[in-house]
Regions:
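Conserved Nudix-box catalytic region and its N-terminal flanking loop in Nudix hydrolases
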Residues: 21-32, 42-79, 83
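Acidic, metal-coordinating catalytic segment for phosphate/diphosphate chemistry
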Residues: 1-33, 39
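Active-site beta-strand termini and strand-to-loop segments that position acidic
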Residues: 37-39, 117-118
Length: 166
């Protein structure tokens, strides 16, 4: 079973737990979201695999995951970016935020660290993780999220607004 890090509202570690159990009980845990932009300022989105146990086949930011216990957060973000999207690039943490969202029968309650990177080219996504991908203009993405929120994971709108208003 995959263990993830439980935290308080200041991101202090308070323990670990099994990922599914934490999502079932809606406990606050550490996560990260990665936003990779190309030189045209477009954001790389991924469509989550239909096999994901929540928010399957929905569009999200470039990569989002949970760091493993006792590992460096930035290194974990780079590791997952390579595993999911086949991309290696420098990442910089730009902000963090807490959000809570119902996702089917589960609850995402995360202290989310947002990282930004730059990459030009095509990703080589892991088909077990990613159903599709695309580069998008931020203004067009904002409009589409407002028009078609059901196509996107709930945390994308929150994170995007925080990124644009930082």
């Amino acid at each position: 079973m995959e263990k993830i890090i439980l935290v308080d509202e200041k991101d202090n570690e308070i323990g670990t737990g099994e990922k599914l159990d934490i999502h079932q009980k809606g406990k606050l845990h550490r996560a990260f979201s990665i936003f990779v932009f190309n030189s045209k300022g477009e954001l790389l989105l991924q469509k989550r695999s239909e096999s994901k146990y929540h928010t399957a086949s929905l569009w999200t930011n470039t990569c989002c995951s949970h760091p493993r216990p006792n590992q460096d957060l930035e290194e974990e973000a780079k590791r997952r970016l390579m595993e999911e999207m086949g991309i290696s690039c420098d990442l910089k943490e730009v902000f963090s935020f807490i959000y809570k969202a119902n996702v089917g029968e589960l609850i995402e309650y995360e202290f989310d660290h947002a990282f930004v990177g730059r990459f030009d080219g095509n990703p080589k996504p892991n088909k077990d993780e990613v159903e599709d991908w695309k580069w998008v203009n931020i203004d067009e993405l904002e409009k589409d999220i407002d028009k078609n929120p059901e196509k996107y994971v709930p945390w994308l709108k929150i994170a995007l607004e925080k990124y644009l208003n930082r």
